[in-house]
A protein has these predicted regions:
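Short, glycine/serine-rich, charged loops/turns that create anion-binding
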Residues: 16, 45, 268
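Alpha-helical segments with a strong preference for the paired helices of cellulosomal dockerin domains
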Residues: 249-272
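Negatively charged
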Residues: 23-243
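Sec-dependent, cleavable N-terminal signal peptides
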Residues: 1-26
């Protein structure tokens, strides 16, 4: 009798373990009003979370925290370590118009390898002073329109990991980033596929390229200047991340006598 009970108990435990293992993890976000935090998870614990939970991969027009107005209350966004297992296909509008958002932590847990749309992702984040997108995999992204529009407190962006070979739309990507001074890019940056880029740098009044090219309202605001600054011969608004070596004034990736010459020319030009 005792052996039979133990056997049944073992079978029951095994069945429970199988059921638990079979439960599929899901990607979702949970808003907690008590600390005005929106947290992203990828697990099987959604039903036990305290707060309001939202589906992901819904598309920009159907994001739950946008349609119910929660976005205006969020002050902090957190990516839980579990979210590293998620593979979202869109991040469009995720933080759109979060005008009170002050910080985003755990961004390294956001895997963007399957994302095709990043439009409006950070648009309107007026209180955000920094955002770490340096690890983003953008090899499948097609849309980046208004991605950082109206991020008025950002002073620098590191886009050195970006591969933009498939991006077709960059309209107003950095528009109204009125305090943005430096945009770092790497070898993966390209505008070859870009079809739409109007007002890409509209009102980026503080922007300076790696060799001193400054934003000017008389310059084209489309993709024309969306490349690494080559100085007067090929002016651009970006800075080569690989050339940001201390003392590398001319951005050629090394420190030598030519940097002294470039520095003298820069000082004599009066652009400083």
């Amino acid at each position: 009798m005792k052996k039979a009970l133990l056997f049944r108990l073992a079978v029951l435990v095994a069945a429970m373990m199988c059921a638990l293992g079979a439960a599929a993890a899901e990607a979702y976000a949970c808003y907690t009003p008590s600390n005005t935090t929106l947290t992203f998870y990828y697990d099987i614990q959604r039903s036990s979370r305290t707060g309001t939970t939202y589906d992901l991969n819904t598309g920009y027009a159907d994001i739950g925290w946008q349609t119910d107005g929660t976005n205006a209350s969020v002050t902090k966004v957190v990516f839980d370590p579990s979210f590293a297992g998620a593979r979202p296909t869109t991040t469009s509008g995720w933080f759109y118009d979060m005008r009170n958002l002050e910080s985003i932590t755990g961004m390294s847990y956001l895997n963007t390898s399957e994302v095709t749309d990043m439009s409006y992702m950070f648009a309107g984040c007026e209180k955000l002073t920094s955002v770490d997108v340096s690890h983003f995999n953008t090899s499948k992204v097609i849309y980046m329109g208004r991605m950082f529009d109206l991020c008025t407190r950002l002073t620098s962006l590191d886009l050195s990991s970006f591969n933009t070979s498939h991006v077709a739309e960059m309209r107003s990507m950095f528009s109204n980033c009125s305090n943005l001074r430096t945009i770092y890019v790497g070898s993966g940056w390209s505008t070859a596929a870009v079809m739409y880029s109007t007002e890409m740098f509209w009102n980026c009044i503080c922007l300076v390229g790696g060799q001193g090219t400054t934003w000017n309202s008389s310059n084209p605001t489309d993709k024309t200047y969306a490349h690494i600054d080559g100085g007067t011969s090929n002016p651009g608004y970006f800075t080569d991340k690989n050339a940001s070596l201390r003392g590398d004034v001319n951005g050629d990736g090394s420190v030598n006598i030519s940097d002294v010459t470039a520095l003298i020319d820069y000082l004599l030009s009066g652009r400083w």
